[in-house]
Curated annotation (Swiss-Prot):
Localization annotation: Cell inner membrane
Task performed by this protein: Pore-forming subunit of a potassium efflux system that confers protection against electrophiles. Catalyzes K(+)/H(+) antiport.
Matches recorded under InterPro entries: Cation/H_exchanger_TM, K/H_exchanger, K_H_efflux_KefB, Na+/solute_symporter_sf, NAD(P)-bd_dom_sf, RCK_N
GO cellular component: plasma membrane
Organism: Escherichia coli (strain 55989 / EAEC)
Keywords, in A-Z order: Antiport, Cell inner membrane, Cell membrane, Ion transport, Membrane, Potassium, Potassium transport, Transmembrane, Transmembrane helix, Transport
Organism domain of life: Bacteria
Name by which UniProt lists this protein: Glutathione-regulated potassium-efflux system protein KefB
Transmembrane annotation, as ranges: 4-24, 29-49, 55-75, 87-107, 115-135, 152-172, 177-197, 207-227, 230-250, 268-288, 291-311, 324-344, 356-376
Span of domain RCK N-terminal: 400-519
Subunit structure, interactors included: Interacts with the regulatory subunit KefG.
């Protein structure tokens, strides 16, 4: 692809994403399906703006690479070791059982047994990009089903190499003996990468961070991700696996959050490009000429994988409320099928339109997943949002809540318990189905669903409620919910949780003045108690705490328009001197005017 063509393709990709994704979100079908439909529209079987799909698809796999790096950052080695049973137990069982069943079904058609084996293995794989994206959207990351789903995906990445090595053996074109020297060199290179990454990455990033230039840190992060991907590709291994390992090696470093911040924008754009490329690869000609075969194949593929995954989840002990989420999110074919089937085609394992039919089946199965998860959500909503059992005593008897609490994690539970203890009518919205199931057993009126959906807020009583308390884990969800409430329910008093000063600034800019930084108040209280243990009178310690709170809030408001670090540092030093002067005056005025408090608890 020439430079001008590449630039034109980039413009078309951006235009397709900007046009299709907001429309898809408005229609309620999700961003992923919007990307896929945009790809169909601009691809060779749509308007025909782009024809070189294979090259773009290979480039767009970098989105999966960046995503796996961020996933690795969230998993330290000890956590990965804890997942070994689910990775090599459930993951291996899923691949083997699904591949065997699907290969058997393919053999019932015109597929030779060799082609059926390759087809079964390829179809058994799930889409890492699709599944992880949907897991994040559904809040499954920290749930049992989400952890198990990630384990299955990780094993599938590990299974890439033996699957590719199996193709020439099935085609009868493998050498009579393996090149053990070549294999040994690859193993040594891989071990060298692990050792080098373990002992060199942190010192290198410490040196780069010392320069104080943010752009260089971002460049170094990109170099690490792309370099590890290229290195693994040269070894014939999965690029995504390489970047995942690099992320795990840095998971316990002090640069973890900065690395994630530097990578996140690239990950989002490239993941969108990947889904658009998958949509472009859909061969509508084959779909038209073999419509019945393709439809049956997609239904059978999704059904077989759901059956296998559901049974494995049940055997593994996953809660019944989470099994369908786990099975549904992994029910599609994956991007690895494109690589495996292309390799098999080069070895002449497929005949006629067999490869095209399999690829169309994989692509359409990926398009069914967002819709399938919508159905799962509706089923879960009916299952867990219905009326309480007769022996349960609901906290709220009125259908018109005074307060809606969004998120019922540790932060939200404290707020909810306080409100309910004071007989306030509240409704709680939570998208972690395991938390919903558990809390409802204890009598809490908790409902399953994504609170960023206007219809759900309306059905939860937002039009009649007086206030909404937002305690989402993700700052992006908080800001999106603030915008929705201000637009559709302007009468609501918005109270929000801020994870830190950055989120506090964003809330203030959005006009939200009632917020709480999750560690600020508890840290202030512990600081007050520390002052008392050091000999300060409890009343003075309380006043010192109040002065600090007021000054910190004032400084927070003053720094909203200031983005330069040097300005913030200068203002912080000035505020510290001001606080010291206030405390000195307080001490002089109140040294002999204590209120006689013995303690303040």
């Amino acid at each position: 692809m020439e430079g001008s063509d590449f630039l034109l393709a980039g413009v078309l990709f951006l235009f397709a994403a900007v046009a299709a994704v907001p429309l898809a979100s408005r229609l309620g079908i999700g961003a992923v399906l919007g990307y896929l439909l945009a790809g169909i529209a601009i691809g060779p079987w749509g308007l025909g703006f782009i024809s070189d799909v294979d090259e773009i698809l290979h480039f767009s796999e970098l989105g999966v690479v960046f995503l796996m790096f961020i996933i690795g950052l969230e998993l330290n080695p000890s956590k990965l070791w804890q997942l070994r049973r689910s990775i090599f137990g459930v993951g291996a069982a899923q691949v083997l059982l699904s591949a065997a069943l699907l290969a058997g079904l393919l053999m019932l058609t015109d597929f030779a047994w060799q082609a059926a084996v390759v087809g079964g293995i390829g179809l058994a794989m799930s889409s890492t990009a699709m599944a992880l994206q949907l897991m994040r959207e559904k809040g499954m990351n920290r749930s049992e089903s989400g952890q198990l789903g990630f384990s299955v995906l990780l094993f599938q990445d590990l299974a890439v190499i033996p699957a590719l090595a199996l193709v020439p053996l099935l085609a009868g074109s493998a050498d009579e003996h393996f090149d053990w020297m070549k294999i040994g060199m690859k193993v040594l290179a891989f071990v060298g990468m692990l050792i080098g990454g373990r002992y060199l990455l942190r010192p290198v990033f410490r040196f780069i961070a010392a320069s104080g230039v943010r752009e260089v840190f971002t460049a170094a992060t990109l170099l690490l991700v792309l370099g590890s991907a290229l290195f693994m590709d040269a070894l014939g291994l999965s690029m995504a696996l390489g970047t995942f390992i690099a992320g795990v090696l840095l998971a316990e470093s002090e640069y973890r959050h900065e690395l994630e911040t530097a990578i996140d924008p690239f990950k989002g754009l490239l993941l969108g490009l990947f889904f658009i490329s998958v949509g472009m690869s859909l061969n509508l000609g084959v779909l038209y000429t073999h419509l019945l075969w393709v439809v049956i194949s997609v239904v059978v593929l999704v059904a077989v994988k759901i059956l296998v995954l559901y049974l494995l989840a049940r055997l593994y002990g996953v809660r019944s409320s989470e099994r369908m989420q786990f099975a549904g999110v992994l029910s599609q074919g994956g991007e690895f099928a494109f690589v495996l089937f292309s390799t098999a085609s080069s070895q002449r394992l497929f005949q006629g339109d067999q490869m095209a039919l399999l690829l169309v089946t994989v692509t359409l199965s990926m398009m069914t997943t967002p819709l399938l998860m919508k159905l799962v959500d509706k089923w879960l909503s009916r299952q867990f949002n219905g009326p309480e059992e007769e022996d349960e005593k609901p906290w709220v008897n009125d259908d018109k809540p005074q307060v809606i609490v969004v998120g019922f994690g540790r932060f939200g539970q404290v707020i909810g318990r306080l409100l309910m203890a004071n007989k306030m009518r509240i409704t709680v919205l939570e998208r972690d189905i395991s938390a919903v199931n558990l809390m409802r057993k204890y009598g809490y009126k908790v409902y399953y669903g994504d609170a960023t959906q206007v219809d759900l807020l309306r059905s939860a009583g937002a039009e009649a409620a007086e206030s909404i308390v937002i305690t989402c884990n993700e700052p992006e969800d908080t800001m999106k919910l603030v915008e929705i409430c201000q637009q559709h329910f302007p009468h609501l008093h918005i109270l929000a949780r801020a994870r830190g000063r950055v989120e506090a600034h964003e809330l203030l800019q959005a006009g939200v003045t009632q917020f709480s930084r999750e560690t600020f108040s508890s840290a202030l209280e512990l600081g007050r108690k520390t002052l008392v243990t050091l000999g300060m009178h409890p009343h003075q310690a309380q006043r010192a705490q109040l002065h600090f709170r007021r000054l910190d809030m004032r400084m927070l408001r003053e720094l909203i328009p200031m983005h330069a670090d040097t300005v913030q540092i200068s203002r912080a030093r000035e505020a510290r001197r001001e606080l010291e002067e206030i405390f000195q005056r307080e001490m002089q005025q109140e040294r002999r005017q204590l209120d006689g408090w013995d303690e303040f608890e």
